[in-house]
Amino acid sequence: MSQRRGHNRRVSIETLENVENPLEAGLTILGSTLTVDDISLRIVEVEAYGGEKDGPWPDPAAHSYRGRTPRNSVMFGRAGRLYVYRSYGMHFCMNISYGPDGVAGGVLLRAAEIEAGHDVVSARRSPDRPSHQWARGPGNLGASVAITLADNGTDV
C-alpha cells in the first residue's frame, strides 16, 4: 500500500505492527493507495477499531471484542492483512489488521476515490450510479474491487 501526502510512500508491515493505538492506525491508512489488480483507490474514509475487552485498546464495537473466533482470527494475526466479512448477508467489507501479532486491531475501509481502473469498476457497478459513488461506503468499496470471503487473510 502506498501513501500520498505530497509524494508516494509505502505503508510497511513494520509501520502497521508498531502502531500505538486505533487513532494512529486510522491516520496511517487514511490517504494511502490500495491497488487490487488493475484498480487503484485512494482511501478517503476509515473507521479504526481496537480489540478485546482485556486488551490494550478495548472496543465494544470491534468484531474482536469478545475474543478470537474463526471468523475474526485475522484481526489477531500479523499486521497488514485483510479481514473480510459479510455485512447484512450481502456486502463484503474490508479491514486492514494492525498492531503486534496476537493483539487484535483493524481499520475498516469505508470509502475510496478511484484513481485507476475506472473501466473495470464501471463494469461491476450500476450504470445508473454516478462514478463518484462507486466506492462510497464499505459495501460499495468491496464490490468495486470484487472482494470476497476468499480474500480474507490476504496480505495488503
Give each language-model segment a name.
Residues 2-156:
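Conserved, well-structured core segments that form or line functional sites
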